[in-house]
Amino acid sequence: MAYLLQMAGFPGSCKTGLAELIAIETGAIVIDRDVIKNAMLGFGLEAKILAEVSYNITFELAKKYIDGGKSVIIDTPCFYKEIVERGVRLCDGTNAYYKYIECLVPSYEIVQNRLQSRQSLETQIQTTTEENYYRTFDKSVKPEHSIALTVDTSDFSKIDMDTIICYLNNEDKGFR
C-alpha cells in the first residue's frame, strides 16, 4: 500500500528526523521542502515567490513518485490549509492513501534548544520567542476527513515506531 504522508509541526519538533526514521523503516521517499527552498536562494526571488515555487516543486516531485507507486513523505510544517488540501488532492485518483503525522513538543525550552543547536539551512529559523511558540506550536492545519496521528517528539528515543508503522499500514486510518 502506497501512501502520501504529510509531516506537520513547529520547526524544531523533529519532523525531519522522524520522516527520515520512517523512510528507513518503510522505504518511503522523503521530500524536504526546506532543502528545495534553500537550493533556490541564489536566484533573487522574493520570499513569497520562493515559498510558492518550493511548494510547487515539492508537490510535483511527490506526484511523480506517487504515480510510480512509491510512498512519499512531505516534510513541511503544515501551517496553511491549502498545503494540506493539496496533499489530499494529490492522492485523488491514485492508489496512495493520505496520511498525516503531527510532531508535537509541548516544551518551548526543548524546541528552542533544538533550533539553536541544529545545523540549520539558511531558510530555516534558528530561534523563536516563547510567546510565538506557545501561540503556534499546536496550530498545524489538520485534514478534515482523515485520522491524523499526533506524536510527542519531546524525547526522540521514546517514539513508538510500531504505532507509527501500524498507522501507516492501516487503510482505515487514511483515505484516497
Question: Model features per residue range: what roles?
Answer:
Residues 17-68:
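Conserved substrate/cofactor phosphate-moiety recognition/catalytic segment
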Residues 120-162, 176:
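Small-molecule kinase domains that catalyze NTP-dependent phosphoryl transfer to phosphate-bearing small molecules
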Residues 53-94, 98:
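Glycine-rich phosphate-binding loop used to anchor ATP phosphates in small-molecule kinases
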Residues 94-115:
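Conserved phosphate-donor/acceptor-positioning beta-strand/loop module used by diverse small-molecule
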Residues 14:
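Conserved glycine(s) of the Walker
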Residues 4:
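Walker A (P-loop) ATP-phosphate-binding motif of ABC ATPase nucleotide-binding domains
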Residues 11:
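The conserved Walker
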Residues 7:
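Hydrophobic anchor at the beta1->P-loop junction of P-loop NTPases
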